Design a protein with these regions (language model features):
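Conserved short histidine dyad/triad with adjacent acidic residue
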Residues: 24-27, 38-55, 90
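Conserved strand-loop elements at the edges of beta-sheets that form or border functional pockets
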Residues: 30, 54, 62, 80-82, ...
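Short acidic-glycine-tyrosine-enriched beta hairpin
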Residues: 74-91
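A short hydrophobic beta-strand segment most commonly corresponding to one strand
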Residues: 60, 87, 101-121
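Short beta-strand His + acidic residue motifs that chelate non-heme Fe in jelly-roll/DSBH
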Residues: 50-52, 70-71, 88, 93-100
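Short, conserved beta-strand element in jelly-roll/cupin
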Residues: 41-45, 54-70, 109-111
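A short, N-terminal "cap"/entry segment at the start of jelly-roll beta-barrel domains
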Residues: 1-37, 117-131
């Protein structure tokens, strides 16, 4: 048994290569091999968002606070609120973040395949974000 104590891991700033705007990442769990699943609480300030990306085994988001937006490639921008759960299928190109005026926090859960949980791509343009 391993108990991950709240606040035991340091918060981190979302790197500019992967995010637009101010993003804080609070790791929640990342068990050792052979386990593959990891989770983090991710907080986006208004206007902040991920770059386009995919996950080899998919991703689940559980919205905790605020108002956010998500989009899969070729689809409309969708609004997400506390209590909403979003599933992105393996390989589905997408982004997620806060709305333009309201911060948003979600728990992100994904699995690693070959030691990798995400493939980062280009940034979401302001035009794409505001659609």
């Amino acid at each position: 048994m391993d108990i991950q104590r709240s606040g035991a891991q340091s918060s981190g700033k979302g790197p500019a290569e992967w995010f637009t705007g101010t993003v804080r990442i609070d790791p929640l769990f990342s068990p050792p091999d052979p386990a593959r699943v990891a989770g983090a609480l991710v907080t986006f300030e208004p206007g902040a968002r991920t770059a386009w990306h995919t996950h080899p085994l998919g991703q689940t988001l559980i919205v905790m606070t605020g108002l956010g937006w998500v989009q899969r490639e070729g689809g409309p921008v969708e609004e997400i609120r506390p209590g909403d759960v979003v599933w992105f299928a393996p390989g589905e190109k997408h982004w997620h973040g806060a709305s333009a005026a309201t911060a948003m926090s979600h728990i992100a859960i994904q699995e690693k395949l070959g030691g990798k949980a995400v493939d980062w791509m280009e940034h979401v343009s302001d035009e794409q974000y505001r659609r």
